[in-house]
UniProtKB/Swiss-Prot annotation:
ATP binds at residues 112-118. GO terms for molecular function: ATP binding; UDP-N-acetylmuramate-L-alanine ligase activity. One of its GO terms (cellular component) is cytoplasm. Keywords: ATP-binding, Cell cycle, Cell division, Cell shape, Cell wall biogenesis/degradation, Cytoplasm, Ligase, Nucleotide-binding, Peptidoglycan synthesis. It comes from Neisseria meningitidis serogroup C (strain 053442). It is found in: Cytoplasm. The gene is murC. Its EC number is 6.3.2.8. GO terms for biological process: cell division; cell wall organization; peptidoglycan biosynthetic process; regulation of cell shape. Pathway: Cell wall biogenesis; peptidoglycan biosynthesis. The lineage of its organism: Bacteria, Pseudomonadati, Pseudomonadota, Betaproteobacteria, Neisseriales. It is an enzyme of class 6 (ligase). This is UDP-N-acetylmuramate--L-alanine ligase. It catalyses: UDP-N-acetyl-alpha-D-muramate + L-alanine + ATP = UDP-N-acetyl-alpha-D-muramoyl-L-alanine + ADP + phosphate + H(+).
């Protein structure tokens, strides 16, 4: 690609998946530019690297580009896309550019409905501890690196593989991981579980014959596809029939301690203890996937232990902001999380309970997309009803039109009928920080959760707290 392409322009460069690829390409020596409707931390970071980031979208931005890369949020009517096509400049999706990056390195692609970002981050952490200096592109900021992407000198690139639009089928990794499969983004698959399964099978089969997949057998849908997988694979999970499994799992504060057992073909059989520097049984599974990849590339047990214990977390994945001051003179622990599907929400809430069993659990939640709220309405009401106090803000539409009886007011009514909780409704997410300060009590843990504009709440809450 380097002999034919010099200038690469990203439309929607501020998106978490786009900004990481842009940064790696910039560090590889390409001339990178981009545009976005809104400034954010990602665009500021890219600008500090010397990348030209334009505010808004106009046709002139693509002048001189050899290729234009778009995110899934960018419509074909976008003026930059229209101008590029008129000038016969290739317009490609983000995943296709990620696939090109994998041609420079041996690719390790992490797929699954939940846990991709954490598993990718843990894998990068262990490979780094093993001295393998990987390149990584992650859907969240790796706290230890201060960025969501980095160009390493080693032979591996670790990246998330996105199933939401089936774009992971562009990738050709030498190793792949499937953390789980759940019924999400079903509009992409014609609301067919069979088509969803086939997409993951096709993703695994994108590997060469010498590749290897690591598949989580704790997921019912993953177990269902195993008979159809014809490429080499190993299983992992909490069951002792898996090739890599965990026992003796215990919470040690906000960490997880467990024993790893390896009975994988071609590897030394045995067991060893690890401490994972994050809470939750679901993160034990994510760690097992990273351990499997690490063993396959030759990392030592010591490197695995170091990478897991020294893991500093990733942005918006049970990200602890510490204690905030309350108007009543007490304090509450603020934690931020990206969870927006009932399955991952339940796992994160269980992690919070396990790490802080003595605290009252307060959840501030912003549903993401009306279609998801409608399709999983009953599952949402069940998981939301498990907390001690609940504040709901309106659905983040993500470009969708409102759907009757699939909004936060409807969720609040359904939860109220169950009789355990009295949900508090906050129509405008901008009012949420002040409302939370009035709801919280001394010693609480407040979990700020959702994939939309609620991500701005922690900073605003911290600022308000400082004024007390």
């Amino acid at each position: 690609m380097k002999n034919r392409v010099t200038n690469i322009h990203f439309v929607g460069i501020g998106g978490v998946g786009m900004s990481g690829i842009a940064e790696v390409l910039h560090n590889l020596g390409f001339k990178v530019s981009g545009s976005d409707q809104a400034r954010n931390a990602a665009t500021e970071h890219l600008g500090s690297l010397g990348i030209q980031v334009y505010p808004g979208h106009t046709a002139e931005h693509v002048n001189g580009a050899d290729v234009v890369v778009t995110s899934t949020a960018v419509k074909k009517e976008n003026p930059e896309v229209v101008a590029a096509l008129e000038q016969q400049i290739p317009v490609i999706p983000r995943a296709l550019m990620l696939a090109e990056l994998m041609r420079f390195r041996d690719g390790i692609a992490i797929a699954g409905t939940h846990g991709k970002t954490t598993t990718t981050s843990l894998t990068a952490s262990i490979l780094g501890a093993a001295g393998l200096d990987p390149t990584f592109v992650i859907g969240g900021k790796l706290n230890a690196a201060g960025t969501n992407a980095r160009l390493g000198k080693g032979e591996y690139i670790v990246a998330e593989a996105d199933e939401s639009d089936a774009s992971f089928l562009h990738l050709t990794p030498i190793m792949s991981v499937v953390t789980n499969i759940d019924e999400d983004h079903m509009d992409t698959y014609g609301h067919s579980v069979e088509k969803l399964h086939q997409a993951f099978i096709d993703f695994i089969h994108r590997m060469p014959f010498y590749g290897k997949a690591f598949l989580c057998i704790d997921s019912e849908h993953v177990r269902a596809i195993l008979p159809k997988v014809s490429k080499p694979y190993a299983t992992y999970g909490l069951d002792d029939t898996a090739d890599i499994y965990a026992t003796d799992i215990e919470n040690v504060g906000a960490q997880m301690k467990f024993t790893v057992h390896v009975q994988m073909k071609g590897h030394e059989q045995g067991s060893f203890e690890v401490v994972l520097n994050m809470p939750g049984r679901h993160n034990v599974l994510n760690a097992l996937a990273a351990i499997g990849v690490a063993l396959e590339v030759g990392a030592s047990v010591e490197a695995i232990q170091k990478g897991l214990l020294g893991f500093e977390g990733v942005g918006r994945r049970f990200q602890k902001y510490g204690d905030i001051k309350l108007p009543n003179g007490g304090t509450a622990l603020l934690v931020d999380d990206y969870g927006h599907h009932p399955v991952e929400m339940a796992a994160t809430l269980a992690a919070a309970r396990g790490a802080y069993p003595e605290k009252r659990l307060v959840l501030a939640f912003q549903p993401h997309r009306y279609t998801r709220t409608r399709d999983l309405f009953e599952d949402f009401t069940k998981v939301l009803n498990t907390v001690d106090a609940l504040v709901l803000t309106e659905v983040y539409a993500a470009g969708e039109e409102p759907i009757a009886a699939a909004d936060s007011r409807a969720l609040a009514r359904a939860i109220r009928v169950l009789g355990k909780l009295e949900p508090i409704y906050c129509e405008n997410v901008a009012d949420l920080p002040e409302m939370l300060l009035n709801v919280l009590q001394d010693g609480d843990i407040v979990l700020n959760m959702g994939a939309g504009s609620i991500n701005r709440v922690p900073a605003a809450l911290l600022e308000l707290s400082k004024q007390i």
